[in-house]
Amino acid sequence: MGHGTNRVEDMASPNNGTAGETVVEIHSVCLPPKKTAFQKLKKRVGDVFFPDDPLQRFRNQTWRNRVILGLQSLFPIFTWGSQYDLKLLRSDVISGLTIASLAIPQGISYAKLANLPPIVGLYSSFVPPLIYAVLGSSRHLAVGPVSIASLVMGSMLSESVSPTQDSILYLKLAFTSTFFAGVFQASLGLLRLGFMIDFLSKATLIGFTAGAAVIVSLQQLKGLLGIVHFTGKMQIVPVMSSVFNHRSEWSWETIVMGIGFLSILLTTRHISMRKPKLFWISAASPLASVIISTLLVYLIRSKTHAISFIGHLPKGLNPPSLNMLYFSGAHLALAIKTGIITGILSLTEGIAVGRTFASLKNYQVNGNKEMMAIGFMNMAGSCTSCYVTTGSFSRSAVNYNAGAKTAVSNIVMASAVLVTLLFLMPLFYYTPNVILAAIILTAVIGLIDYQAAYKLWKVDKFDFFTCLCSFFGVLFVSVPLGLAIAVAVSVIKILLHVTRPNTSEFGNIPGTQIYQSLGRYREASRIPGFLILAIESPIYFANSTYLQDRILRWAREEENRIKENNGTTLKCIILDMTAVSAIDTSGLEAVFELRRRLEKQSLQLVLVNPVGTVMEKLHKSKIIEALGLSGLYLTVGEAVADLSSTWKANGQP
């Protein structure tokens, strides 16, 4: 601004109407420091892709220290490995063995949920945890198969390929999907594109996980009721139809055993939730249930054949599966699509779980490192007969409560799984399928977070609607389409916020120089002759026309209000641009056009406090020159005071 910085004026106060000599200090609105196009681009790229400034720790370091810091950055195990001692090892061994007791039955159960051989679930609880222990930055994340990713993979692949009639092709697609999931996850981390997963909003995930939990629970009726011929579809209607259409296959022995062990598992879960110190009861109950139920089936095997069991599981380490990866053929697109969707879901869950427990212990989990760790873990897993894995909330909670100190607990868990694979597999021969169904039911029931849904209803109705779209989409359409519907609704919400931003009318709070929304503050009052508006978003091509029309409507409504109340003629419209973080050429054109149209109505347009980049573009586009000497101010208070004194000096009412 070109006008002076201090004036003494004889003016009327906008608050009480009394006249007096008041010092009005008018501050200039400055342009930001000049920068080259390259400097601007460099800063913008840094803000978008490197908000955490990962190279900061390397500055002012010797080459030797930089190499050490680089190794610690790539392999977090070097950060805490040098300080590892027997005390930490004891805690990690206890927690590792504890989560192993949960991981073994869950691994077998979740593999069946993905329509894969049970042994694949154990393979997936061996190799991935070892890789995560080296690459992961979370101390408490317990890695392995999870219910949601297993369900999504099973439902998407089985729509095109039968897991029973074409089991080899199905297995190939599962491993290939895992490979592409890993590539996608690692790429997000390497390219620092983690913000892409933010399109899965909290509301979307609440509805999706709840809907998936219901579908998973209903699918377990096959095992709980002893049904042999069951639908492979995942929607609620065909699942329930299959349950009642095959009533003749219901087995009372299976039902009794299922209800009994399900009651035990739910009771131990409830006890552990009420008294966290008794976490070990809930952690040990799945394995204990597997052992007891296996013994029961073994003892009564000659008296009844109604209870189905797992059967033979091969002993030995993970066989290599690199030769089974499917990189050409009719189903490649299906493998890629399944990999991306399961990759996004597992990545979202893993990072969320890791950050949850990191916040409890006051340390930080690096999101990009986690993406790379989980991605490389799944890529390696796909070559060693594993399917999609990530951090499990239930296992991580047990790991945390058991006193885990570092990622060594994952190594201990993997070692326990290794012993199981090498020596204990024949013991699972008579493990009944009904106990696996009960374990899955107990695990997924906690995914139905009705309290979070109620909070959405109380806080944000649109988020609640998104949650419902996700929930019912999964239940009645399909798992991937339900997720897609919810993401589409979330994107529509973003578009609405961008294309139809909020504008509000400001007034003065008496006795102060504070201007706030008339709708929020009842004591705020209008200033005669002024219409003060605040724009609460960037001005882009998508909303520039809307904002122009909305501001002109504000002006018409204000003039009509003045006529009805015989008030002071409207002379000036002030736009508070404090919240306008950016503007493009369409926005600049809209501001210029708005000034021209208001000028025809004998109304002055004044801009207040544009931020640096906006101010720079206003200056370069000559809009500042067009607005004139009194068209730009630092605060609303200064604008009102200066313009009022100018009008009074010119004899205007």
UniProtKB/Swiss-Prot annotation:
Pfam families: STAS, Sulfate_transp
Alphabetized UniProt keyword annotations: Membrane, Sulfate transport, Symport, Transmembrane, Transmembrane helix, Transport
TM spans (from-to): 93-113, 116-136, 141-161, 168-188, 195-215, 248-268, 280-300, 332-352, 371-391, 408-428, 434-454, 472-492
Entry-linked InterPro entries: S04_transporter_CS, SLC26A/SulP_dom, SLC26A/SulP_fam, STAS_dom, STAS_dom_sf
Membrane topology value: Multi-pass membrane protein
Domain STAS: from-to ranges: 520-643
A GO CC annotation given for this chain: plasmodesma
Localization terms from the record: Membrane
GO biological process, one term: phosphate ion transport
GO molecular function term, any single one: symporter activity
Keyword check for Transport: yes
The family this protein is said to belong to: Belongs to the SLC26A/SulP transporter (TC 2.A.53) family.
Stored NCBIfam families: sulP
Function: H(+)/sulfate cotransporter that may play a role in the regulation of sulfate assimilation.
Name of the protein in its database record: Probable sulfate transporter 3.4
